[in-house]
Amino acid sequence: CRIARRGGVRTIALLDNVIPHEKRPFDKWLTRYFLGSIDGFVYMSEQVHSDLRLFTKTKPAVFSPHPMLDGYGEPLPRGEACAALGLDPALRYTMFFGYIRDYKGLDLLLDAWGMLKREGKLEGHKLIVAGEYYSGKERYAEQIDALGIRGDLVLMDRYISDGDVAKLFSAADLVVQPYRHATQSGVTQIAYWFDVPMVVTGVGGLRELVPDGKVGYVTEPDAAAIAAEIDRFYREGKAAEFRANILRFRERFTWERMIGNFRSLYDRIAGTQPGQKR
């Protein structure tokens, strides 16, 4: 970026995260060095905007939420998706999806599932855990056995191909994101594309993306709170209502809208010299 700017090129960065999920040496120095080479920013959540302003107060920035991830194909009929995955279509499936990393709170969801089992609320239900372990596989296995819920899970702890993404989200009745912290999540945008209601924790940008009581529920990063919202979703029969709302709310997450936001930012910095404030 710095070399490009010497030739008069203005630079724009799309910010997913400013501060890494897992801290490493020199993070702040490297982040400051990179941000110093950029003329404008497109950020995808207010949490990222707040983090950006820790490093630069005045450079232009515009908000544009992550568009729906629509590259996995169209939703499949639920029965077809279940058959392809070897799942019983008579059951209800709650799903945790994505890389299994400590900050994503899978342990909280497993504890919540254990609570629901003890309360006798898992009849006809399974929890799908789909994704590769980033770390701690043995620890999660021990937790699952201690809770006595192995028979209540569908474990797909492996790389998930693009084709299986469509099948999983077409089979799922509810996606849960029990994150301890986050900026935003691509999982949310996949759920929007496949019209799947969500339970998310109100951390980072997740609260901005999932209107509480409209397309899902927003709760605390706490096992009992997560269990309560999962139970509420099924007990109150919210699936049809939330799916209908998703079709309306997801219009905020189009690629055309993001392109427009990039263009508006470009118009603000066009005609300036690289590094010049406007």
Language-model-detected regions and their locations in the chain:
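A short helix/loop element that forms part of the nucleotide-sugar donor recognition site in Leloir-type
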Residues: 73-87
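Acidic donor-binding loop of glycosyltransferase active sites
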Residues: 167-183, 196
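Short hydrophobic beta-strand element within catalytic cores of glycosyltransferases
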Residues: 174, 191, 197-200, 210
